[in-house]
């Protein structure tokens, strides 16, 4: 007969009113392997091989790798980004505010000024992969929304724009490590000429490009026409290496004359352009390289020289403007749209500052796409950047680890009678500047609308292997494209032209899609909070990533603190969003928990999620282990607040490890459901003197409670860890003390998942809220009783206990540097526990 839920509760000694025998007899029984096996069979916990098909969905939970279909919103608003500029002299400003900084604060702030990123190897992808075809039905809409988002980021100074292989431009205030290029005089339509100080080799190159190339090095004859340059990499004097992409239709932006002329006054340039804008875009920046045969040049115009237009008008190099002088091919021809505007604005925009960068190919290293900003805000979009190449494969980067506060540390730290508020740092990641040397590794961009459409539309034919150039301009015209562009024209106007050109952007601030970013953000905010705490010693400031909380004794005090801290953060260049400041009163909502003076509990929305999960949980049906991962993720978050804690979930963990389906028996489901119906707060640990000690040998146990000594023996010898755990349980139940001294590291760690299942569950309940102090065996007063000697008294130790806040130390204390001697217990082991000797 299967084990009923009532019997199971009695077995686990969870019912207070049951007439169980003395704990010293009952508990060792739960460690019995035979009993554990029988219960597992009864509850159907061990039966991992099932023949029935697996269930792949429970409520909202699907397998870990099944993708929920994302929904594209044509109405998405691109969020606005403030001009974020973290001041370079942040260390000096902090020192003016609080006096000299500690070594750790300095080290952390230097780490992000500027941040550096050196991956082992970088894989370059073609520009076509720049914008991911994430929404196949909304390709054009998604393309323009994403391009607009990228343009917004560039305008806000968050991205660099690659101008040439060795130069980039950006908007906003420059940092000292960004080496600006010297500009030549720009008057009228004179070309922009970069002459970087260190890039040019031995001989100096003349002040302007135009003068050098009066006789064309490329051998372009006037009658050959501009499109003869579709294979510029084949010419003799340019090394093939100098052009990273010969197939990418980046020709020379041509003019009608024979020499390569960078002025904007030749008639073949985009017609009908206003003279005002003419100077802004028509010139080209080029990077100069020395080749063995003299001066070689590399040209990159960002205009795809796609096709010679069919009509007899002048030839444009710009795909968009070529439509202007063509005969419409149908009522859905793009020429109708292009003729709507006289002035389509520049083909290319340049930033306010031009800097030199390491050699950057015309490629991307990650794709981008848009999603909802968050589940509660679907009106705004968020850019997702996929730099997962750096976390994969043999060359993956092992990201630095950093301390995340665990539940007990957090409670010890924040459970107090303070009044709280939390600050919202807007676009926190985009505060931290990246060194330009990282740019070649973090490239995003797009190949331009013509190629994007050509690649995705079925009717366009790329003929004769023409290096990706469209043979016929009108091949890309279609009703769908025309309708989409007409609608987008209402939103973006002349920018449609700008966004239809190819672009390559590199990150100037840390991106979210790289494992380095969370580490850097955590270092940054923890150092800032450390400074704030020292400036206001009677208050508490704490942060986890971009979540910053301030606590003060009274509401008035908190408000004045808020004003002072906000002004300080603004003076450093940190942007706060005042509309999102939340005042919590005396119970703080932080990291998914509610923390008050009584302790910590999970937030209400998590409790509701758990209830919903149990309502949907099927009984006697095998559930896919990937779905079990999701269920365990949710239940594991709230496990410390239940009677039996993590040990109760061990059968689920076991099935996930074995990659087998798990079947919930009615009793096990009822047991878990009951566990999560009553949640108990996790209280903060108090410091005190340890008066109660426990010790055990495989055959017996001993306790020292004050001046009293007790001992007992086990019916059969037990593993030493199990024996020590039983002794600790006896000490707690006999003395009621919340502070127990033990010499066993596993008991100290309070992780009872490696014990026999039934014992782990019960011990977790008995020892809930107990703090342990390490006492060396030689000094343990309970050592003699456990060996059966009651006569000899060792003096009682005065063992003070101080609760720890783990490695999330308040004053950013750096962890001690480990010696290079091998550690006896490996760090990944559950047995390892960080204790400081008394």
From Swiss-Prot:
Terminal protein domain (TP), as annotated region: 1-179
Any Pfam family matching the protein: DNA_pol_viral_C
Listed GO MF terms: DNA binding; DNA-directed DNA polymerase activity; metal ion binding; RNA-directed DNA polymerase activity; RNA-DNA hybrid ribonuclease activity
Reactions listed under catalytic activity: DNA(n) + a 2'-deoxyribonucleoside 5'-triphosphate = DNA(n+1) + diphosphate; Endonucleolytic cleavage to 5'-phosphomonoester
InterPro entries given in the database record: DNA/RNA_pol_sf, DNApol_viral_C, DNApol_viral_N, HBV_DPOL, Rev_trsase/Diguanyl_cyclase, RT_dom, Viral_Replic_Matur_Polypro
Gene3D superfamilies: 3.30.70.270
Keyword presence, Transmembrane helix: no
Domain named Reverse transcriptase: residues: 352-595
Annotated stretches, region: Spacer: 180-341
One GO biological process term: DNA replication
Regulation of its activity: Activated by host HSP70 and HSP40 in vitro to be able to bind the epsilon loop of the pgRNA. Because deletion of the RNase H region renders the protein partly chaperone-independent, the chaperones may be needed indirectly to relieve occlusion of the RNA-binding site by this domain. Inhibited by several reverse-transcriptase inhibitors: Lamivudine, Adefovir and Entecavir.
Region (Polymerase/reverse transcriptase domain (RT)): 342-685
The protein's Enzyme Commission number: 2.7.7.7, 2.7.7.49, 3.1.26.4
Signal sequence segment: none
Binding site for Mg(2+): 424, 546-547
Feature type site, description Priming of reverse-transcription by covalently linking the first nucleotide of the (-)DNA: 65
Residue span of region Disordered: 218-242
Keywords assigned: DNA replication, DNA-binding, DNA-directed DNA polymerase, Endonuclease, Host-virus interaction, Hydrolase, Inhibition of host innate immune response by virus, Inhibition of host RLR pathway by virus, Magnesium, Metal-binding, Multifunctional enzyme, Nuclease, Nucleotidyltransferase, RNA-directed DNA polymerase, Transferase, Viral immunoevasion
Function: Multifunctional enzyme that converts the viral RNA genome into dsDNA in viral cytoplasmic capsids. This enzyme displays a DNA polymerase activity that can copy either DNA or RNA templates, and a ribonuclease H (RNase H) activity that cleaves the RNA strand of RNA-DNA heteroduplexes in a partially processive 3'- to 5'-endonucleasic mode. Neo-synthesized pregenomic RNA (pgRNA) are encapsidated together with the P protein, and reverse-transcribed inside the nucleocapsid.
Miscellaneous remark of the record: Hepadnaviral virions contain probably just one P protein molecule per particle.
Domain notes: Terminal protein domain (TP) is hepadnavirus-specific. Spacer domain is highly variable and separates the TP and RT domains. Polymerase/reverse-transcriptase domain (RT) and ribonuclease H domain (RH) are similar to retrovirus reverse transcriptase/RNase H.
Homology family: Belongs to the hepadnaviridae P protein family.
Record-given protein name: Protein P
Source organism of the structure: Hepatitis B virus genotype A1 subtype adw2 (isolate South Africa/84/2001)
Phylogenetic classification of the source organism: Viruses, Riboviria, Pararnavirae, Artverviricota, Revtraviricetes
Gene name, Swiss-Prot/TrEMBL: P
């Amino acid at each position: 007969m299967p084990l009923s839920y009532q019997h199971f509760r009695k077995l686990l000694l969870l019912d207070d009113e049951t007439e169980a025998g003395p704990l010293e007899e009952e508990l060792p029984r739960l460690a019995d392997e035979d009993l554990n096996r029988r219960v597992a069979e009864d509850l159907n916990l061990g039966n991992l091989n099932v023949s029935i098909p697996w269930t792949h969905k429970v409520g909202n939970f699907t397998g870990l790798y099944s993708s929920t279909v994302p929904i594209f919103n044509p109405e998405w608003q691109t969020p606005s980004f403030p001009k974020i500029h973290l001041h370079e002299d942040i260390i000096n400003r902090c020192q003016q505010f609080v006096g000299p900084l500690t070594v750790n604060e300095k080290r952390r702030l230097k780490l992000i000024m500027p941040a550096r990123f050196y991956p082992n190897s970088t894989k370059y992808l073609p520009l076509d992969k720049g914008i991911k075809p994430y929404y196949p039905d909304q390709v054009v809409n998604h393309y323009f929304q994403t391009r607009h988002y990228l343009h917004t980021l560039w305008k806000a100074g968050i991205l660099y724009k690659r101008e040439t292989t060795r130069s980039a431009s950006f908007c906003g205030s420059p940092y000292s490590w960004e080496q600006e290029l010297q500009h030549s005089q720009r008057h009228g339509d004179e070309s922009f000429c970069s002459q970087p100080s260190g890039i040019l080799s031995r001989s100096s190159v003349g002040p302007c490009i135009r003068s050098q190339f009066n006789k064309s090095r490329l051998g372009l004859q006037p009658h050959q026409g501009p499109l003869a340059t579709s294979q510029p990499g084949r010419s003799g004097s340019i090394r093939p290496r100098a052009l990273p992409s010969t197939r990418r239709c980046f020709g020379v932006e041509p003019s009608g004359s024979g020499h390569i002329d960078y002025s904007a006054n030749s008639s073949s340039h985009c017609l009908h352009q206003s003279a005002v804008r003419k100077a802004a875009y028509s010139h080209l920046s080029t990077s100069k390289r020395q080749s063995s045969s003299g001066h070689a040049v590399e040209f990159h115009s960002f205009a795809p020289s796609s096709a010679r237009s069919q009509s007899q008008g002048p030839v444009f190099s710009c795909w968009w403007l070529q439509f202007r002088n063509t005969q419409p091919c149908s009522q859905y021809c793009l020429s109708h749209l292009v003729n709507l505007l006289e002035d389509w604005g520049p083909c290319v925009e340049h930033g306010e500052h031009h800097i030199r960068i390491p050699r950057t190919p015309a490629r991307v290293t990650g794709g981008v796409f848009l999603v909802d900003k968050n589940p509660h805000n679907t009106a705004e979009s968020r850019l997702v950047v996929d730099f997962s190449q750096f976390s994969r494969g043999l060359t993956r980067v092992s990201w630095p680890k950093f301390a995340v506060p665990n539940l007990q540390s957090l409670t010890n730290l924040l459970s107090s009678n303070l009044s709280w508020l939390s600050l919202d740092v807007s676009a926190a990641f985009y505060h931290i500047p990246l060194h330009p040397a990282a740019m070649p590794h973090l490239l995003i961009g797009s190949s331009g609308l013509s190629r994007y459409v050509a690649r995705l539309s079925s009717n366009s034919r790329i003929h004769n292997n023409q290096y990706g150039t469209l043979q016929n301009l009108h091949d890309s015209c279609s009703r769908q494209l025309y309708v989409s562009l007409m609608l987008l024209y209402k939103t973006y106007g002349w920018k449609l032209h700008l966004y239809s050109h190819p672009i390559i952007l590199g990150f100037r601030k840390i991106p979210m899609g790289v494992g380095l970013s969370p580490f850097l953000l955590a270092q940054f905010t923890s150092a800032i909070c450390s400074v704030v705490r020292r400036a206001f010693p009677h208050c508490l400031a704490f942060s986890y990533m971009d979540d910053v909380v301030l606590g003060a004794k009274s509401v008035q005090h908190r408000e004045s603190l808020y004003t002072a801290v906000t002004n300080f953060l603004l003076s450093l260049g940190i942007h706060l969003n005042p509309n999102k400041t939340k005042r919590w009163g005396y119970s703080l909502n932080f990291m998914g928990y509610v923390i008050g003076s009584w302790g910590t509990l999970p937030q209400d929305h998590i409790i509701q999620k758990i209830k919903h999960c149990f309502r949907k949980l099927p009984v006697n049906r095998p559930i896919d282990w990937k779905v079990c991962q999701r269920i365990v993720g949710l239940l594991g978050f709230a496990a410390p607040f239940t009677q039996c804690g993590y040990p109760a979930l061990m059968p689920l963990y076991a099935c996930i490890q074995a990659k087998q389906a798990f079947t919930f028996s009615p009793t096990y489901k009822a047991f878990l459901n009951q566990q999560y119906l009553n949640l108990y707060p996790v209280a903060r640990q108090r410091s005190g003197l340890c008066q109660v000690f426990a010790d055990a040998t495989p055959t017996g146990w001993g306790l020292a409670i004050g001046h009293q000594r007790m001992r007992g023996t086990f019916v059969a010898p037990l593993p030493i860890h199990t024996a020590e755990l039983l002794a600790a349980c006896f000490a707690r139940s006999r003395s009621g003390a919340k502070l127990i001294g033990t010499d066993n590291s596993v008991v100290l760690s309070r992780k009872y998942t490696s014990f026999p299942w039934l014992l782990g569950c019960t011990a977790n309940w008995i020892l809930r809220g107990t703090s342990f102090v390490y006492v060396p065996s030689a000094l343990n007063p309970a050592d003699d009783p456990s060996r059966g000697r009651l006569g000899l008294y060792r003096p009682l130790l005065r063992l003070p206990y101080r609760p720890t806040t783990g490695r999330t130390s308040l004053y950013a204390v750096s962890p001690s540097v480990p010696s290079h001697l091998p550690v006896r217990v490996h760090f990944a082991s559950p047995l390892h526990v960080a204790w400081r000797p008394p």
